[in-house]
Amino acid sequence: MKKRVIIHVDMDAFFAAVEQRDNPELKGKPVIVGGVPGERGVVAAASYEARKFGVRSAMSLWEAARLCPHGIFIPGNHKKYQEVSEKIFRIFREYTPLVEPVSLDEAYLDVTGSQKLFGPGAEIGKKIKKRIFEETELTASVGVAPNKFLAKLASEVNKPDGFCEVREDNVLDFLAPLPVEMLWGVGEKMKERLNDMGIKTVQDFWELPEFFLRKKFGVLGQNLYYLSRGIDFREVIPERVPKSLGKEITLQKDSSDVDYLLGKLLGLTMAVGRGLRREGFYAGGISVKIRLSSFITYTRHSRFFEPTWMDDVLYREAKRLFLENYHGELPVRLVGVTATPLVPVGGGRQISLFGEDLRRENLYPIIDRLNHKYGNKTVTRAKILKISGRG
């Protein structure tokens, strides 16, 4: 099984932090979002200044006012929080399409297949954290680990504004000293039962066999056996996985010039290739769309034996489909290229590439980074130019 790299991002006191950002007079003060004292509501978020008084999310507003009588209570503005959240999630999706939202201010990201393009998981986590602060003026706590459970724990240990990476070789060292209540499923009552048994830290679980924990606590006991050892098989489940990625262009003037049309097809194919690599997908196949001046439209599709993101492979097949289906009967008005179905990088593809093919595949993310830094078309593979008839 391929080793996964999961990032958990949790914004720090999100709603309250947005209010403090937008109103400098609130900075450094105990801000409580959710309503005003006397209402029958609950706390939606509390700034860290308010948390020092014991105020927590989901607490009644009445209790929050009792604990923090000098707190600044704000009804909140969900529309504003939603807009900020959308900006943050757009940042996430620039690094991977595998984003599982937990709430407006929290998400899991599977960046296993994004490392060729953006570097190791820890580097991606730091980039995301930096981008969030630069673009929203808000802090986030980020955890990077081999699975969702460990990534969430990692994001919690250094809050607020924290960063923590748990590597496969230090999972047990990371878990050992943590109190048992850090494990999912351990509430106050369960904590008391475990403490009565002498189990106070995660390491204490390691002395107990699985059958004993299952007999004592049922399915929860079995879960605790695995979690205490850092084992979690759950996958990051995106809100939605796109089925295709495409580009099309309506020509400024209808044309029957095949060389000109193939040039446009090449540009579209390279743009689709960049999009695949940026979004973390391979193309399982490719479709070419040809709309004639009469508005008659042809769409032809071909499947790849091996899903790919390589521009030369994409273009060779797109060119074949175009030439087999356009015979110059009428000028072309529109041409388009679509990669479909999409295969997420890191899953769903049987790797059979080796030698030169694998080196070629790994070369494209490097070309993308150079072109991103110095401008598109700064670097283009000679093979692309040869296929297009331009080299």
Curated annotation (Swiss-Prot):
Textual note on the cofactor: Binds 2 magnesium ions per subunit.
Enumerate the cofactors the protein uses: Mg(2+)
So where does Mg(2+) get bound? Answer: 10, 105
Start and end of every UmuC domain? 6-187
Subcellular location(s) of the protein: Cytoplasm
- Top-rank taxon of the source lineage equals Bacteria
Q: Which keywords, in A-to-Z order, does the entry hold? A: Cytoplasm, DNA damage, DNA repair, DNA replication, DNA-binding, DNA-directed DNA polymerase, Magnesium, Metal-binding, Mutator protein, Nucleotidyltransferase, Transferase
- What GO MF terms are annotated? damaged DNA binding; DNA-directed DNA polymerase activity; magnesium ion binding
- The record's EC number reads 2.7.7.7
Q: What is the name of the protein in this document?
A: DNA polymerase IV
Origin species: Carboxydothermus hydrogenoformans (strain ATCC BAA-161 / DSM 6008 / Z-2901)
Q: Gene behind this chain?
A: dinB
